[in-house]
Structures are given as structure tokens and as C-alpha cells.
UniProtKB/Swiss-Prot annotation:
The lineage of its organism: Bacteria, Pseudomonadati, Pseudomonadota, Gammaproteobacteria, Aeromonadales. One of its GO terms (cellular component) is cytosol. It catalyses: D-ribulose 5-phosphate = (2S)-2-hydroxy-3-oxobutyl phosphate + formate + H(+). This is 3,4-dihydroxy-2-butanone 4-phosphate synthase. Keywords: Lyase, Magnesium, Manganese, Metal-binding, Riboflavin biosynthesis. Belongs to the DHBP synthase family. It is an enzyme of class 4 (lyase). PANTHER family: 3,4-DIHYDROXY-2-BUTANONE 4-PHOSPHATE SYNTHASE, GTP CYCLOHYDROLASE II-RELATED. The keyword Transferase does not apply. It comes from Aeromonas hydrophila subsp. hydrophila (strain ATCC 7966 / DSM 30187 / BCRC 13018 / CCUG 14551 / JCM 1027 / KCTC 2358 / NCIMB 9240 / NCTC 8049). The record marks H136, E174 as: Essential for catalytic activity. Binds 2 divalent metal cations per subunit. Magnesium or manganese.
Length: 217
């Protein structure tokens, strides 16, 4: 990962701290994964505070596949089956069936409808009957152990929410360029500058979690 591009956002620990502060304030963050992995960047918001306007930005600036990152516990609570029984995707991305709020939505595809669906899924007393399947929101099941177990955007999202003291649910979508191609690190940095969003990497988050583990040992 080209650290010189990220230097304006501080060192790895400072970048994570800035991201946590932004999430607590209801703002978005940009997370890049390893260059030898997907080499992509995701726009991420806290599920509990995401607004219609932020969802509209995500739909406009990203790939359109809006994903709700959930813990395994929440997936079980909602009784969401996995999208496929035998996952053959290269990085084992753990999609469940897609969802829609059972009440309060129209077609389910608008920014407001997707926010309604997300709020239904993350409510404290959420039940399987609160959701219809299929829908326009794509839940992802995070692996237990977070980025120390799997260095994916799903795990990074849940880790960030937990470290920020928020509900362990986040919304992500892959940032794209105007021509529809995937945004890389230079594009993330430019987008972060334009929208005052912190930029960090999954490697930063791994280092941060390892440091916390060492301090508590």
C-alpha cells in the first residue's frame, strides 16, 4: 500500500482514530484493502446514524450494491439464510439473501426505502417477520474475530463500529469512478479530500487492533 498517498491522514493509528471520530459524528469513512487482494475502496457509514442524503450519495458515487454488514449473531436473530450453500467466490464474501423492510417502503429501491430497511434490520428487537426477502439491501455476515480473522471490508466495517462504541452494524458500497471502473487508492484520497472523509486501510485497522491487544495483555 502506497503510504505516501495516505500521509496527509496521519500514521496508521491516527488514521484509525480519525475514522472512529468521524463515525461517532455520523460521517462517512473510506477504507482501502490490500493491493494484492481486491485493491478496492469502500465508502462506509454507521448503520444506526446513516441518513437518506448519505444513502443517496452512496448510490450516486458507488457501485449500487449497497451492503449491510452484520454480526453472525444478528444474522441468526433475523434468520437470514446465506445466499448460496456452497460459496465459491474468490474471497468467500458472505452474502445472505437480500432484504426489504416489511413495512414503510414502496418499491424498496429509493435511498429512503433502503434506510428504512436498514433500520428495520438493526433495531434492537428486530424479528425475521420485520423483513421481506428478496429486496434491495444486501446483508453481509462478518466473520467472528474481525480483520484479525479475515482482512475484508465486511469485517473492517463491523470492527470500526465496535471500536467507535456504536452498534456493530455498518453500510458499505464500493467506490467507483465516473467511467464505472473501480476507485483505487489515489481516487479514494481525492474523494476523501473533497468530502472531508478520513481514509484508512485494512492494514491500519489490523495494526490498531494488534496494538490494543498488546496493551491489554
Amino acid at each position: 500500500m502506497n503510504q505516501s498517498l495516505l500521509s496527509e491522514f496521519g500514521d496508521p493509528i491516527a488514521r484509525v482514530e480519525a475514522a472512529l471520530a468521524a463515525l461517532r459524528a455520523g460521517r462517512g469513512v473510506l477504507v482501502a484493502d490490500d493491493e494484492d487482494r481486491e485493491n478496492e475502496g469502500d465508502l462506509i457509514f454507521a448503520a444506526e446514524s446513516m441518513t437518506n442524503e448519505q444513502m443517496a450519495m452512496m448510490i450516486r458515487e458507488c457501485s449500487g450494491i449497497v451492503c449491510l454488514c452484520l454480526t453472525d449473531e444478528r444474522v441468526r436473530q433475523l434468520e437470514l439464510p446465506m445466499m448460496v450453500e456452497a460459496n465459491s467466490s474468490h474471497y468467500q464474501t458472505a452474502f445472505t439473501v437480500t432484504i426489504e423492510a416489511a413495512q414503510g417502503v414502496t418499491t424498496g429501491v429509493s435511498a429512503a426505502d433502503r434506510i428504512t430497511t436498514i433500520r428495520a434490520a438493526i433495531a434492537d428487537g428486530a424479528r425475521p417477520s420485520d423483513l421481506h426477502r428478496p429486496g434491495h439491501v444486501f446483508p453481509l455476515r462478518a466473520r467472528t474475530g474481525g480483520v484479525l480473522t479475515r482482512r475484508g471490508h465486511t469485517e473492517a466495517t463491523v470492527d470500526l463500529m465496535q471500536l467507535a462504541g456504536l452498534k456493530p452494524f455498518g453500510v458499505l458500497c464500493e467506490l467507483t469512478k465516473e467511467d464505472g471502473s473501480m476507485a483505487r487508492l489515489p481516487d479514494l484520497v481525492a474523494f476523501g479530500r473533497q468530502h472531508q472523509m478520513p481514509v484508512l486501510t485494512i492494514e491500519d485497522l489490523v495494526q490498531y487492533r494488534q496494538l490494543l491487544s498488546e496493551r491489554s495483555a
